[in-house]
Amino acid sequence: MASAVPLTMMWEEVTCSICLDPMVEPMSIECGHSFCQECISEVGKEGGSVCPVCRRHFLLQNLRPNRQVANMVDNLRKISQGAKESPHGELCVVHREKIHLFCEEDGKALCWVCSQSQKHRDHPMVPIEEAAQEYQEKLQVALNKLRHKQELAEKLELDIAMKKASWKGKVEAHKLRIHEEFVRQKNFLAEEEQKQLQKLEEEERQQLRTLGDTEARLAQQIQALQELIAELERRRRGSALELLQEVKSVLERSESWNLKELDVASTDLRNVFYVPGIKKMLRTCGVHITLDPQTANPWLILSENRRQVRLANTRQEVPENEERFDSYPMVLGAQRFDSGKVYWEVDVTGKEAWDLGVCRDNVRRKGQFLLNSDTGFWIIWLWNKQKYEAGTCPQTPLHLQVPPNRIGIFLDYEASTVSFYNITDHASLIYTFSECAFAGPLRPFFNPGFNDRGTNSAPLILCPLKTGW
């Protein structure tokens, strides 16, 4: 039978700290402490609404039954009743003598006759109550570790659920963008719209299936963990003999149990969207853009035809005028747009960093400033050779399947949108700024980036466009 000391400790765990009796209909509050239903209800009625143990606030409507504590109370009552009915303890099945010793080497409970046998006589022995207390403590340590691992597993389960929800939200947002893009391209592209939606939905099914499989594997691990925890709890509630039966094997299993690493899918969407014929449609809005030397940073060199820009090795001798950028290697297009639809393309071959887009005509030119839609810049950029971002606030990471050698920029002033296309990848849509607060004329924006020891010396080149169908 379990010794008196561990039983006393277990009774203390299920004692209500309000009435100081074993809990009746145990209820848990938000902080995790449990009390008799009647006791904690009285505390709430008196207007205290704070935990008697930790003084944290709680709400009566959030009380929840603690079945684990209720079961423990019932089991302890049964153990106590069994102890009263069997005062002489367990008897050895071989010698019919009282079992009161524990062989530490063999891990077996013995009577005094067994302890004197040739098999056990030279082994270290301790009283069974002492052994039970020792292994009770070891089981408690093992149980605490497993419960911690269970918490980690449950947190991972919650993370997977959140990723699934995130996937669904992103897919719905992407569907809307696809739909809007096809509407702009008129009804003759309706069939292509459906094809692209089917691709996206297939990606959704695949990713959710992957997350579902991961969730199922996690559920299996959680079930195995719960079964192991239940076995440890059952042993702790049983007699000393039941507790010690194969106890070393159980402890080894609990110590070796670890949550297996799971492959949780990324929530990043793959870029699957492009419209056949989009390049021809965009180029019907093509315009001839040239660079404005009056706005060029002194470290920039413009080509004679003002269609290329690169970073110089030395500062250029240029007038100090108000229009010129003085801190960053930037330059604006000479053209201004305050209505209509316009489109141009820029060659970025060999570049490891660049910024492209449009900005208000009156943006700040001097000193340091942020490049985002709040400050009048609607741009995307590449930095560190592979990091694409949109200049939102905060920045939006962009995931391109094919690195672009040519970027298309489409401005629809009346629709308040600026769209960017990867011409290298079937003119697939990279990003669209919507509901832009233009508030005045806009100008094309260019930044070839810093040279970075010669690795980013290639120029930005405005591409000639063949307009029409």
Swiss-Prot record:
Q: In which pathway does it act?
A: Protein modification; protein ubiquitination
Gene Ontology CC annotations of this record = autophagosome; cytoplasm; cytoplasmic stress granule; cytoplasmic vesicle; nucleoplasm; nucleus; P-body; ribonucleoprotein complex
Q: Name the PROSITE patterns for this protein.
A: B302_SPRY (PS50188), ZF_BBOX (PS50119), ZF_RING_1 (PS00518), ZF_RING_2 (PS50089)
Q: Where are the zinc fingers (RING-type)?
A: 16-55
Keyword match Transferase: yes
Name the domain of life this protein comes from. Answer: Eukaryota
Q: Which residues form the B30.2/SPRY domain?
A: 268-467
Q: How is it modified after translation?
A: Autoubiquitinated; does not lead to its proteasomal degradation. Deubiquitinated by USP4; leading to its stabilization.
Recorded catalytic reaction(s): these are:
S-ubiquitinyl-[E2 ubiquitin-conjugating enzyme]-L-cysteine + [acceptor protein]-L-lysine = [E2 ubiquitin-conjugating enzyme]-L-cysteine + N(6)-ubiquitinyl-[acceptor protein]-L-lysine
| Primary location class | cytoplasm
Name residues in a coiled coil.
128-245
Residues binding Zn(2+) are C92, H95, C114, H120
The family database entries (InterPro entries) matched by this protein are listed as: B30.2/SPRY, B30.2/SPRY_sf, Butyrophylin_SPRY, ConA-like_dom_sf, PRY, PRY/SPRY_TRIM21, SPRY_dom, TRIM/RBCC
Carrying Phosphoserine, the residues are S266
Q: Which keywords does this Swiss-Prot/TrEMBL entry list? A: Cell cycle, Coiled coil, Cytoplasm, Cytoplasmic vesicle, DNA-binding, Metal-binding, Nucleus, Phosphoprotein, Ribonucleoprotein, RNA-binding, Transferase, Ubl conjugation, Ubl conjugation pathway, Zinc, Zinc-finger
The places in or outside the cell where this protein is found are: Cytoplasm; Cytoplasmic vesicle, Autophagosome; Nucleus; Cytoplasm, P-body
Instruction: Provide one Gene Ontology biological process annotation.
Output: negative regulation of innate immune response
Q: What is its EC number?
A: 2.3.2.27
* ZnF segments: B box-type: 87-128
Q: What does this protein do?
A: E3 ubiquitin-protein ligase whose activity is dependent on E2 enzymes, UBE2D1, UBE2D2, UBE2E1 and UBE2E2. Forms a ubiquitin ligase complex in cooperation with the E2 UBE2D2 that is used not only for the ubiquitination of USP4 and IKBKB but also for its self-ubiquitination. Component of cullin-RING-based SCF (SKP1-CUL1-F-box protein) E3 ubiquitin-protein ligase complexes such as SCF(SKP2)-like complexes. A TRIM21-containing SCF(SKP2)-like complex is shown to mediate ubiquitination of CDKN1B ('Thr-187' phosphorylated-form), thereby promoting its degradation by the proteasome.
Entry similarity comment: Belongs to the TRIM/RBCC family.
Q: Subunit composition?
A: Homotrimer. Interacts (via C-terminus) with IRF8 (via C-terminus). Component of a SCF(SKP2)-like complex containing CUL1, SKP1, TRIM21 and SKP2. Interacts with CALR, CUL1, FBXW11, HSPA5, IKBKB, IRF3, SKP1 and VCP. Interacts with SKP2; the interaction with SKP2 does not depend on an intact F-box domain. Interacts (via N-terminus and C-terminus) with DCP2 (via N-terminus and C-terminus). Interacts with ULK1, BECN1 and with ATG8 family members, including GABARAP, GABARAPL1, GABARAPL2 and MAP1LC3C/LC3C. Interacts with TRIM21 and SQSTM1/sequestosome 1. Interacts with IRF3.
Q: What is known of its domains?
A: The coiled-coil is necessary for the cytoplasmic localization.
List the PANTHER family hit by this protein, alphabetically. Answer: E3 UBIQUITIN-PROTEIN LIGASE TRIM
Protein name in the entry:
E3 ubiquitin-protein ligase TRIM21
List the source organism.
Answer: Bos taurus
Query: What lineage, starting at the top, does this entry show?
Result: Eukaryota, Metazoa, Chordata, Craniata, Vertebrata
> Gene that codes for this?
TRIM21
